[in-house]
Amino acid sequence: SWASFATGKNPGKTTIFDFLKRDPKTYMPDFAMNSVSQQQVLWGKWTSVIIAPSIGVILFLIIFFSLYFSQCTRMTLLVSSIGGTVAVCGGLLFLIDRYLPQERPVVINNRQGKTIWELSAEHGIKTRVIRFPNTFPPDHIEDGEILSGLGVPDIRGTMGTFSYYTTEHTAQSENTEMGGKVIQVTWTRNKIETIIYGPRNKLFKRPPSEINLPLRLEIIHNEANHAEVTPPLPSLRKGGINGEETKGLANPSSSQGVEKGGISSSDLVSVSKSLSLTLHVETKKESQAIFPTSQEEVKNGLKSITSPPSQGRGGGVEDATVHPHPNPPPSMGRESDTLSEHILPAPGGRGIRGGGAEPVPGNNEDIRLLKIETSGQTQVLKEGEWSDWLVLKFTFNPFVKMYGIARFHVISIEPLKLYLSPINFHPERPPLPISYPEHYAADIAKKIGLYKTLGWAIDTWALNEERINEEIFLDDTNFTINKEIEMLKEFLGKQDARLYIQLFEFTDRIQHMFWRFREEDHPAYDREKAEKYKDVIFESYKKMDEIVGMVMEKLDDKTVLFVCSDHGFNSFKKAVNYNTWLVKNKYMTLTNEGDTKEKTLEDLFGRGQFWPNVDWDNTKAYALGLGDIYINLQGREAYGAVRPGKQYEKLRDEIKEKLEAWVDAENGQKPVRRVYKREEVYKGFDPNHVPDLIIANNNGYRVSWQTSLGGIPKDLLEDNKKNWSADHCSLDPEITKGIFLSNMKFDVAEANIMDIFPTILQLLNIPVPDDIDGKVLK
């Protein structure tokens, strides 16, 4: 939906209708927000052939005339000239072929439509956009800045690959469903030698396929004051990483913190991401900024914005509706000028910084510490402690290097349980542009220290796979958000842009992971943990409200503030395997029904094998992404089995009717609330691109992770025992409404998320384009 916010167009026009798309010629899934292509470096495979002989000719002439004027014999002249030239040319051919790539990856932003920040910049309005989704690579805006958000990958090219090192050999090894790496290790004389998984080698065709780093771990005892040993890092630029001599692996000023927002609460109004827009128009991402005490207060006190079937998938939605309140709620936190360090209160009344660690013994007691060495840096940590940022240098060859940053958390030393966060691009040396101007990401780092650049900054995947616990997750959430608050404060201190947009998604991430503590009948409910964490969602809203209050405190009467979300939330108790449903209802045929290998995100980003046992010639439909069904259409799909026209329409009607009538035999509920035909949801779409049917689930049901990746598990429905316990993806937008708040009165009965685009343009006196779908709010 954020693409629709940015352009005023429906997802059919922006082409961002899901996190995933598919290639009809190969049936292969891919990331929808951006695509990776290859760009030739110099002359590609001919570079060495062109450069070496060219230099050879010049060298030959230099040697020849040097010897000629020194009156050498003809034979000496000829042999020396040719010999020297051949030797140098041969060496150049070898060096260029070995150390200079023929191609390099380039990223293409797939979002279509001109954005609000491009239009504002064209009209001379200073604009700043912070961590907005689908801004990677960033747009070029004159006299403005963009820091890319959701869509920026980690150093492995994924949405966030964490690593988990353990001596417990009962743990699942290798790749988890959500893309984590589980590395089983063994102590040898209190030492472990292992690796940090780095970037895939997409520059050179020769091995290695991945550029990894050695990692050395050692148990040490009685380390006085448990001091950190940190040899100086090579500076990434003169003056160090933060403008000073860099002494460790991290920026000493790294703060804990608060990050992104956007979600909602079950029976309350929902939200997912909230933005602050200043217009000076400001949009700031929030989740339910205020907490009504009843459903009636929700209806009377907030504008509620709904999204259609694509909502919450990274695209906008067509049917989003808002029920406005004439006045901005008075409780938006004007009294708070300073923010508490932690967004969420810790269970038991203590801070969450420790990540759940037990109290540390006194200096006279025998304590075990973990010494971590990698990339020329050393840190010594207690159990329950986070490392500072480590700057990781991945060397492809002496001339090609890639820099990343990551943090360790020591969960346990014996047995070893060591978590390594996804490796972010270093903001001062990203391999691809993550800001506009390109130096803007580095400028921010100079002011606030190192920060996360990964689009999906809060690691929900590790908590979902139970490699970290809730307190570690909240600790990292605080760390993340505080940095983003610092970015916001940078603007509020100067207010040097007329249009400011920033996205906070921490409320979204928290609600995904903590909803299970609100429902005793949820398959993932844990009574003991619920006592600690049942209020975390509400605390995240309070923190977002505090952020909004801080913004309002700084605004004058002429500045307009918008706070909005792109979706709400519903419970996720059961996962629906739609490809399995298609198989059981004879719409998909398998060559081997026993082959139900689980798919992982590593398969997606690593270009693994998909659909290995599907008989496409006898398959009518297939499911992929977050509730999308594609018809195996002749002339569009590579092995199309369904004729366009009457057969196509009859099949869509049949699948729609059966899915909407389907009843869960276990409880009598309907998993599917509605199935939309694409023309009911989108306008101006590419029929080769957009799914033919969009499934909208009822509360409690969601498309399974396996269906999203093209998997075909055995069972139709599965209890969701994962920590990811609530969602908006594949839920019917009619029951998944978000919010829209403003300090400006609007006299409208309903609104659409696309309406914000033209409304802001009008406030900025910019002509509204004719080809958009949104309407100006009055």
Identify the role of each PLM range.
Residues 8-229, 248, 262-305, 340-341, ...:
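His/Asp/Glu-rich, glycine-adjacent segments
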Residues 138-141, 571, 575, 654, ...:
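Polar, surface-exposed loop/tail segments
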Residues 235-240, 244, 256-261, 311-315, ...:
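Glycine-biased, low-complexity coil/linker segments
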Residues 492-493, 500, 682-711, 720-770, ...:
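C-terminal substrate/ligand-recognition segments
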Residues 516-535, 713-721:
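A solvent-exposed, charged loop/short amphipathic helix patch at secondary-structure junctions
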Residues 541-583, 587, 669-679, 684-686, ...:
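Metal-dependent active-site segment of extracytoplasmic phospho-/sulfohydrolases and closely related
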Residues 578, 582-645, 722-764:
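Substrate-binding rim/cap in mid-to-C-terminal beta-strand-loop elements of soluble/periplasmic
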Residues 641-720:
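Acidic, glycine-rich loop-and-strand cores that form catalytic or ligand-binding grooves
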